[in-house]
């Protein structure tokens, strides 16, 4: 059997103006079709708290260490703490108490990387309160922790066990003088 082989010569040539192969988009409509009304600069409808500026005061920055969420506020009362715990329970977060005996304020010890704001490790008070449904249970544990460690910083955290993240953390108790 005889084999016949044929070759076809192809000529490739670069197009001198390949950028012009796509036509420019010309489908924009003129502005005449869109009615535009020119409004005067009227700022009377914008929200303002200008009348209340005199009563707003910031936390004094000198000599005050920053702790956790809500650290710019005065110390929370028992009722306010209970409301915060109710909030984390409504969000189905697991309450947990942690305490620190030496440094309750932010500083870097164990981690120097910028990914996590703080290198501290706090000691957990008992186990996370899985199944807790009442803020009174958390407040009872807080009182026990304060009784055991009166010179400790104690914080309450809310842990989302589905997403495996800590969602809220705030100082519940500080030593005298802080």
Curated annotation (Swiss-Prot):
Primary location recorded for the protein, binned into one broad class: plastid
UniProt keyword annotation of GTP-binding present: no
Xref: SMART domains: RuBisCO_small (SM00961)
Residue spans crossing the bilayer: none
Cellular localization per UniProt: Plastid, Chloroplast
Pfam families attached to this UniProt entry: RbcS, RuBisCO_small
Keywords: Calvin cycle, Carbon dioxide fixation, Chloroplast, Photorespiration, Photosynthesis, Plastid, Transit peptide
GO CC entries: chloroplast
Gene Ontology molecular function, alphabetical: ribulose-bisphosphate carboxylase activity
Record carries keyword Methyltransferase: no
GO-annotated biological processes: photorespiration; reductive pentose-phosphate cycle
InterPro entries: RuBisCO_ssu, RuBisCO_ssu_dom, RuBisCO_ssu_N, RuBisCO_ssu_sf
Transit peptide: 1-54
Stated family: Belongs to the RuBisCO small chain family.
Miscellaneous comment: The basic functional RuBisCO is composed of a large chain homodimer in a 'head-to-tail' conformation. In form I RuBisCO this homodimer is arranged in a barrel-like tetramer with the small subunits forming a tetrameric 'cap' on each end of the 'barrel'.
Assembly information from the UniProt record: Heterohexadecamer of 8 large and 8 small subunits.
Function: RuBisCO catalyzes two reactions: the carboxylation of D-ribulose 1,5-bisphosphate, the primary event in carbon dioxide fixation, as well as the oxidative fragmentation of the pentose substrate. Both reactions occur simultaneously and in competition at the same active site. Although the small subunit is not catalytic it is essential for maximal activity.
Name of the protein this chain belongs to: Ribulose bisphosphate carboxylase small subunit, chloroplastic 2
């Amino acid at each position: 059997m005889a084999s016949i082989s044929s070759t076809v010569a192809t000529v490739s040539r670069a197009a001198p103006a390949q950028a012009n192969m796509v036509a420019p988009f010309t489908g924009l409509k003129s502005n005449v079709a869109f009615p535009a009304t020119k409004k005067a600069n009227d700022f009377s409808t914008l929200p303002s708290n200008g009348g209340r500026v005199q009563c707003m005061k910031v936390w004094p920055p000198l000599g005050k260490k920053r702790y956790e969420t809500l650290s710019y506020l005065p110390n929370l009362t028992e009722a306010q703490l209970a409301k915060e715990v109710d909030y984390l329970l409504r969000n189905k977060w697991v309450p947990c108490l942690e305490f620190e005996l030496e440094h309750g304020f932010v500083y870097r010890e164990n981690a120097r990387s910028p990914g996590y704001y703080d290198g501290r490790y706090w000691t957990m008070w008992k186990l996370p309160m899985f199944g807790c449904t009442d803020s009174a249970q958390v407040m009872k544990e807080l009182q026990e922790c304060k009784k055991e460690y009166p010179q400790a910083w104690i914080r309450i955290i809310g842990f989302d066990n589905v997403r495996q993240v800590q969602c809220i953390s705030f100082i519940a108790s500080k030593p005298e003088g802080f």
